[in-house]
Swiss-Prot record:
Gene that produces this protein: dapB
Protein name: 4-hydroxy-tetrahydrodipicolinate reductase
Species of provenance: Oceanobacillus iheyensis (strain DSM 14371 / CIP 107618 / JCM 11309 / KCTC 3954 / HTE831)
Residue numbers binding (S)-2,3,4,5-tetrahydrodipicolinate: H156, G165, T166
Keywords: Amino-acid biosynthesis, Cytoplasm, Diaminopimelate biosynthesis, Lysine biosynthesis, NAD, NADP, Oxidoreductase
Pathway(s) the chain acts in: Amino-acid biosynthesis; L-lysine biosynthesis via DAP pathway; (S)-tetrahydrodipicolinate from L-aspartate: step 4/4
Length: 265
């Protein structure tokens, strides 16, 4: 039986790729889309999509969820609306799969509680690329032996949040095995504010935003006489589709919120 899916943000770069992937999967059925405009139109009426995509577009999430019996709500929007979408989907007992980052700890706690109350799975993944998830796992392994580490994340210049959710998640995983410590010279001084990057438990995180980039990260470890670099590069957004496909399938069997694709692999 096909899984009925709603996609929020279909005209974005990630959303467009997700629509293409979902409509090619025999076990998935795209029943509706949520967008901030084009209410009442079908996807096929928009220039970037195939004419035969007769999938209705809504601008109001309540109307969308009331009109369609969806199993999964895939949100690929922005932090400003992603939290509201996720919360509303759970209230309608629809399982969210969320690629939007930038949620606060308080928002995540609220969504975890709501997911349990509704007995509906929810997956929030800072990164859907399988390679990026492995990079985070390998970084956690390396941090046991190399506690001095800095993270450099590079993204396209339209990304709104910094540092990226992937960088923060990587740092959180490293925190699990690394004692808090200040890195660098104890008397170091920034002659330009922010030159040393963001400080997370003594680790430094540096964010780059440039046109031409998609999603890239290096985790650089330093030790006596050696360095170790673990890196991942997404060359295009097709790299995220295997992760989204996996999440859509697995969220159907969950009854609580899972944060991070690494917890499903």
């Amino acid at each position: 039986m096909a899984i009925n899916i709603i996609v929020a943000g279909p005209r974005g770069r990630m959303g467009y790729e997700a629509v293409q992937m979902i409509t090619k999967e025999d076990s998935f059925r795209l029943v509706a889309c949520l967008d901030h405009k084009h209410d009442g139109l079908n996807l096929g009426e928009l220039e970037q999509f195939s004419d035969d995509l007769q999938v209705p577009i809504y601008t109001d999430i309540d109307s969308c969820l009331k009109q369609h019996q969806a199993d999964v709500f895939v949100d690929l929007t922005t932090p400003e609306v992603g939290y509201k979408h996720t919360k509303t989907a759970l209230e309608y007992k629809v399982r969210p799969v969320v690629g939007t980052t930038g949620f606060t700890d308080e928002q995540l706690s609220e969504l975890k509680e709501l997911s349990k109350q509704q007995q509906r799975g929810c997956i929030i993944a800072p990164n859907f690329a399988i390679g990026a998830v492995l990079m985070m796992k390998f970084s956690k392994m390396a941090a046991k032996y190399f506690p001095n580490v800095e993270i450099i994340e590079k993204h396209h210049d339209q990304k709104l949040d910094a540092p990226s959710g992937t960088a923060k998640k990587t740092a959180e995983l490293i925190q699990d095995v690394r004692e808090s410590q200040k890195q660098g010279h104890p008397k170091e001084e920034e002659t330009l504010p922010g030159a040393r990057g963001a400080d997370m438990d003594g680790m430094r995180i540096h964010s780059m935003r440039l046109p031409g980039l998609v999603a890239h990260q290096e985790v650089i470890f330093g030790g006596a006489g050696q360095t170790l670099t673990i890196s991942h590069d997404s060359m295009n957004r097709a790299s995220f589709m295997d992760g989204i496909r996996e999440c859509v399938n697995q969220v159907m069997d969950l009854e609580e919120l899972v944060y991070g694709l690494e917890n499903l692999l």
